[in-house]
């Protein structure tokens, strides 16, 4: 991937037909991209929510309530999701060092290995899809997607997502 900065185009004025069309196209592309990500995840035995949990835990241990909030799911849903990951040996529960009544979830070595395989499979899928655009655009598309991930993390840190 190139280290060259991505040149931002001046976006069309908000509320114009052109901006509305681009936003609709982007929203639909995001939905299609989510589907394209689930294909390689299935090949490594993960669902999209499981992948997201493993990726979150790769950043550090987390309590079920924190994971539920980050995934925007209910506590019962996160409990079921975590039970499956614990059963598979990808995640382990540990007592919270600050509050013995709470548990924290930790990514195991098998979980880290599975996450690495999933990252690689998804990355390969993105590269394969990117070959269907003009030469050089694939690298820019992947870099732009990575930057969008940075924007999501920044918005989450600012409390706006």
Identify the residue ranges that each predicted region occupies.
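DNA-binding alpha-helical recognition surfaces that contact promoter or target DNA
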Residues: 55, 80, 143
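N-terminal helix-turn-helix DNA-binding core of bacterial DNA-binding proteins
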Residues: 35-77
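Hydrophobic alpha-helical membrane segments, chiefly transmembrane helices and signal peptide h-regions
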Residues: 31, 78-81
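Short amphipathic alpha-helical segments with heptad-repeat character
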Residues: 20-27, 31, 72, 112, ...
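N-terminal leader segment of winged-helix/HTH proteins
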Residues: 1-45, 107, 136, 152, ...
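Charged, amphipathic alpha-helical coiled-coil/dimerization segments
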Residues: 83-146
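Exposed, interaction-prone assembly regions rather than primary DNA-binding/catalytic cores
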Residues: 137-161
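Generic structural concept
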Residues: 27, 58-61, 108, 142-149
């Amino acid at each position: 991937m190139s280290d060259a900065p991505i040149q931002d185009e001046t976006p069309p004025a908000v509320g114009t037909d052109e901006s509305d069309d681009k936003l609709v196209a982007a929203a639909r592309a995001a939905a299609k991209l989510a589907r394209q990500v689930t294909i390689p995840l299935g090949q490594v035995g993960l669902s999209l929510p499981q992948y997201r949990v493993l990726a979150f835990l790769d950043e550090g241990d987390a309590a079920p309530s924190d994971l539920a909030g980050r995934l925007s799911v209910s506590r019962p849903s996160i409990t079921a999701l975590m039970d499956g990951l614990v059963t598979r040996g990808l995640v382990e529960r540990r007592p919270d060092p600050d509050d013995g009544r709470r548990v924290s979830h930790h990514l195991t070595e098998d979980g880290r290995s599975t996450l690495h395989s999933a990252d690689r499979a998804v990355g390969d899928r993105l590269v394969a899809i990117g070959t269907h655009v003009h030469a050089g655009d694939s690298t820019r598309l992947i870099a732009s997607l990575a930057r969008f991930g940075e924007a999501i993390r920044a918005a989450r840190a600012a409390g706006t997502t």
